[in-house]
Every structure is written in structure tokens, then in C-alpha cells.
């Protein structure tokens, strides 16, 4: 019985240490989430302004823009930029988006020649490699608050591959941050660029004289616009990652506390049984006298 008590005490001590670690990781993730949400909010304000200016420019002429970034072409090949984390301990964050991507590929494509994958995050890259799915570009090791410079390589690669007609449409696949408890898998079509023009927004630049001409400006602006929108998805995904990490660590901490409570009850019962046994033996010994 004594050995059993010591064993339970060891388990309790070990689980307490685990709960302290997961609790600390939860606090770290919460701090990262707060910072990421502020970053995402600031970028969203910027993105809305950029989109408004670009929409106004596209709508500044009665003739539709003829820029290749906006023209739909026959889809012979699709590009998927898949955003995952580099590490685990983030609950179902990675599995949700990867399941969504695989399901979509199986529905839309019959062979690998019809699509290409760019992987941002080690988990996604390793996932596709393990399944012998070709990945044309991989970027690992993003910081907790990624700057555009960190992701410039893969973002520029995606846009340039589209411009070179290596694929005919681009989807960015990521987890959208809803709140600290909820994220949703998204597959957003980024290329070709499409604008939902509202009546009150149209013609806001019609009276402006553009130097040089509109098409020349769009040739420079639209690739940068596409890159900024893709970067916005990366910022959003990173925010969702921190939220998933915080939730996973909170769940782990709660589970550890539950295990500690169960072990404590088990320990008390075992200790009570041990004491009862000792008393019984003492009484039996006294009776024998």
C-alpha cells in the first residue's frame, strides 16, 4: 500500500509541473494573441484604404481595365498557397485547413498536373511531402508577428508564377481568426483580382487626370495590391494560430487540474485504507493478548 501511495504522490507532483508549464504557455500565447490582434486590426485599416484606392482607379474609366492580373483565363492549372504553423501544440489549427485543402483538391482535380502548392509553414510542407504531393515552394520559420519582408519571397513567387501563367488562378488557404475560441478554414481566390464595385464608389476618380495613363499605373499597382492582400491573409492566419495555441494550452491546463483532483481523491482513499488497515491490525494484536 505504501508503494502505491508514493506512486500516486509522484504522479500528482509530475502533473502539477505539467500544469505549470501549460499554464505559462497559455499566458505567453495570450500575450502573443493580443499583439497579433492589434497588428491585424491595423493592417485591416490599411488594406481597406488600399482596396478603396485601387477600386476607384479601376473604375475611373468607362472602359474595363485590361490588366492581365484582372482578366479571367481558361483554368488549366490552379495554385494553392497553404498557410500552416511551423510547430504543434495548436489544437486542430493545422488539421482543419489541411483537410479542407485535400478535400478540395480531390473534388476539383483528377491529377497533379492540374494544381501546384506553395506551402507557408513547416507543418503543411511536411504533410504534403509525406503524401508525395509536389510542393513548388516552401517557406518556414516565420516569427510570431511576421513582417512583409519575412514573407516577401513566397508572396512574390505566387504573384510572379501567376503572371508567368504557370497557373491560372490562385487560392490562399488559411484559418481565419474569428475570436479567441473560434477560427474557420478559408480558401480565398486572390488571383485573378476581382473587385465588387458598389454604385456609390464608382466614378469617384472620373474627374481626375491620371499621369501616366491608367493602364500603366495598374501595371505597377495591381501586383503590389495582390501581394498586400495575400500578406493580410498571413497576418490573419498567424492571429488564429496564437488563439489556437492559447486555447490548446488552456484545455491542457484544465485537464491537468482535473487529473490532479482525481489523483488527490485516489491518494486520500488509499491513505484512508492504509490507516484503517493499520488500526485493524493493532486491534487484532491487542485482542490476541
From Swiss-Prot:
GO terms for molecular function: ATP binding; proton-transporting ATP synthase activity, rotational mechanism. Pfam families: ATP-synt. One of its GO terms (cellular component) is proton-transporting ATP synthase complex. Coiled coil: none annotated. It is found in: Cell membrane. GO terms for biological process: proton motive force-driven plasma membrane ATP synthesis. Its main location: membrane. InterPro entries: ATP_synth_F1_ATPase_gsu (IPR035968), ATP_synth_F1_gsu (IPR000131), ATP_synth_F1_gsu_CS (IPR023632). SUPFAM superfamilies: ATP synthase (F1-ATPase), gamma subunit. It comes from the Bacteria. Keywords: ATP synthesis, Cell membrane, CF(1), Hydrogen ion transport, Ion transport, Membrane, Transport. It is a peripheral membrane protein. Produces ATP from ADP in the presence of a proton gradient across the membrane. The gamma chain is believed to be important in regulating ATPase activity and the flow of protons through the CF(0) complex. Belongs to the ATPase gamma chain family. F-type ATPases have 2 components, CF(1) - the catalytic core - and CF(0) - the membrane proton channel. CF(1) has five subunits: alpha(3), beta(3), gamma(1), delta(1), epsilon(1). CF(0) has three main subunits: a, b and c. This is ATP synthase gamma chain. The lineage of its organism: Bacteria, Bacillati, Bacillota, Bacilli, Lactobacillales. The gene is atpG.
